[in-house]
């Protein structure tokens, strides 16, 4: 089941409740065609991977959370474990990595676009 997240509080509660499980968060918008296209597959993955938590954030109704996670494109998928964004465990193609600037900057895993095969591959790798 995909949990709808509407606030920073709900987001923090989800990450806290996940413990050591992988959390996959889709940042999307109702007007986004690719978001609509990938939604059924994302829902199906939430039923297939029961040991992974799936969540969805509407970027238009959750602007504080969208800014906090530095979302610039929809759909964007971010993955978390132990309440933190997952850092790459293996080499990733440059287009799949996002670099943050400023103090403490590091490479994090962030997947943009409606490519369900790549998303599922990363879920299997990070479980």
Swiss-Prot record:
GO terms for cellular component: acrosomal vesicle; cytoplasm; Golgi apparatus; sperm flagellum. Testis-specific. Expressed in spermatozoa, sperm tail, elongated and round spermatids. It comes from the Eukaryota. Residues 2-127 form the Thioredoxin domain. Pfam families: Thioredoxin. Keywords: Cytoplasm, Developmental protein, Differentiation, Disulfide bond, Golgi apparatus, Redox-active center, Spermatogenesis. It is found in: Cytoplasm; Golgi apparatus. Disulfide bonds join 32-35. Gene3D superfamilies: Glutaredoxin. GO terms for biological process: acrosome assembly; spermatogenesis. InterPro entries: Thioredoxin-like_sf, Thioredoxin_CS, Thioredoxin_domain. Belongs to the thioredoxin family. In vasectomized rats, autoantibodies against Txndc8 are present. May be required for post-translational modifications of proteins required for acrosomal biogenesis. May act by reducing disulfide bonds within the sperm. PANTHER family: THIOREDOXIN-LIKE PROTEIN 1. This is Thioredoxin domain-containing protein 8. It comes from Rattus norvegicus. The gene is Txndc8.
């Amino acid at each position: 089941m995909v949990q709808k997240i509407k606030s920073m509080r709900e987001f923090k509660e989800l990450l806290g409740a996940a413990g050591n499980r992988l959390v996959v968060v889709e940042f999307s918008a109702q007007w986004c065609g690719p978001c609509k296209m990938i939604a059924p597959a994302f829902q199906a993955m939430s039923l297939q991977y029961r040991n992974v938590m799936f969540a969805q954030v509407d970027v238009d109704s959750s602007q504080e959370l969208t800014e906090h996670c530095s979302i610039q494109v929809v759909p964007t998928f971010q993955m978390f474990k132990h309440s933190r964004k997952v850092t790459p465990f293996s080499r990733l193609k440059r287009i799949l990595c996002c670099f943050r600037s400023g103090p403490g900057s590091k490479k994090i895993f962030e997947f943009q676009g409606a490519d369900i095969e790549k998303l599922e591959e990363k879920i299997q790798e990070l479980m």
